[in-house]
C-alpha cells in the first residue's frame, strides 16, 4: 500500500486511468464486432446497402483504433494488428477469392 501522499494520489490516478482505458477498449471491441457482423450480413445477402454498412462500420472501427493508439490505450503494433484483422475480414466479404485455375 502507498505510504505518502503523492504515491496514494498516483494509485488513485492509475485506477481512474485503468477504468477509462477499459471503457475505451470495450467500445473499440464493440465497433470491431459490429464490423465483423456486418461482413457476415453482407455474405448472407450481398447488396449495395450491406456493402455501405460494411464500409461505414470498418471506418468507425478504424477511427476508434487509431484514437486508442493516439491516446496510449493500445500499443501501435496492437492497433495495426486489429486493423489488419478487420481489413482481411472486409476484403474476404466484399471481394471473395476467385476459384483456383487448376
UniProtKB/Swiss-Prot annotation:
<dbReference type="InterPro" id="IPR036510">
    <property type="entry name" value="Ribosomal_bS20_sf"/>
</dbReference>
<dbReference type="GO" id="GO:0070181">
    <property type="term" value="F:small ribosomal subunit rRNA binding"/>
</dbReference>
<dbReference type="GO" id="GO:0003735">
    <property type="term" value="F:structural constituent of ribosome"/>
</dbReference>
<comment type="similarity">
    <text>Belongs to the bacterial ribosomal protein bS20 family.</text>
</comment>
<dbReference type="GO" id="GO:0006412">
    <property type="term" value="P:translation"/>
</dbReference>
<protein>
    <recommendedName>
        <fullName>Small ribosomal subunit protein bS20</fullName>
    </recommendedName>
</protein>
<comment type="function">
    <text>Binds directly to 16S ribosomal RNA.</text>
</comment>
<keyword id="KW-0689">Ribosomal protein</keyword>
<dbReference type="InterPro" id="IPR002583">
    <property type="entry name" value="Ribosomal_bS20"/>
</dbReference>
<dbReference type="Pfam" id="PF01649">
    <property type="entry name" value="Ribosomal_S20p"/>
</dbReference>
<dbReference type="GO" id="GO:0015935">
    <property type="term" value="C:small ribosomal subunit"/>
</dbReference>
<keyword id="KW-0687">Ribonucleoprotein</keyword>
<keyword id="KW-0694">RNA-binding</keyword>
<keyword id="KW-0699">rRNA-binding</keyword>
<dbReference type="GO" id="GO:0005829">
    <property type="term" value="C:cytosol"/>
</dbReference>
